[in-house]
């Protein structure tokens, strides 16, 4: 990120996680390393759905984001999904550039002592903004409102959606 945005002093990332093993620990570790290297971090207070991470990146004007999740893989796994400033997962050419930089870094190059002044916890207000944006994106709200017998079933399936829309 530092090399992708040279000369910028206002770099920021959004960091989130899901409900997988050690998700919070890994998200905090990611936040600590970014902050130790001079990058502001918006860290979600608890687990959040992946689309909200993407939304927050754009809403906050962050240059990147990380979601600690293994996505559709078995629950025993965890992973690291990287996002760019458009809120989308990193694609070419950025993915190749990132891997190239990873290959150049040694453990001695990484700063680990967090700068807690650069870590901001986010949550409730972003949830409201996200849910409002989802509602506004509905194709035709009037059609939905006219459905007298409309029933909707929602299940977060024990996932991250349970935080912003409890079942």
Predicted regions and their residues:
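Conserved oxyanion/phosphate-binding beta-strand-loop segments in alpha/beta enzyme cores
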Residues: 1
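Gly/Ser/Thr-enriched, mixed-charge loops and adjacent short helices
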Residues: 4, 78-167
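Ferredoxin-reductase
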Residues: 6-85
């Amino acid at each position: 990120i530092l090399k992708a945005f040279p000369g910028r002093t206002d770099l920021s990332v959004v960091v989130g996680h899901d409900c997988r093993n050690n998700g919070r620990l890994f998200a905090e570790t990611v936040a600590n390393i970014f902050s130790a290297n001079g990058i502001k971090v918006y860290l979600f207070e608890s687990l959040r759905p992946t689309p909200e991470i993407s939304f927050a990146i754009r809403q906050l004007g962050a240059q990147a984001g990380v979601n600690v999740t293994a996505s559709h893989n078995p629950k025993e796994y965890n992973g690291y999904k990287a996002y760019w400033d458009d809120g989308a997962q990193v694609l070419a050419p950025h993915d190749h550039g990132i891997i190239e930089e990873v290959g150049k870094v040694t453990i001695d190059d990484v700063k680990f002592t967090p700068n807690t002044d650069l870590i901001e916890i986010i949550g409730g207000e972003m949830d409201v903004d996200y849910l409002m944006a989802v509602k506004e994106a509905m194709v035709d709200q009037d059609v939905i409102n006219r459905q007298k017998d409309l029933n909707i079933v929602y299940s977060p399936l024990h996932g991250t959606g349970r935080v912003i829309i409890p079942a």
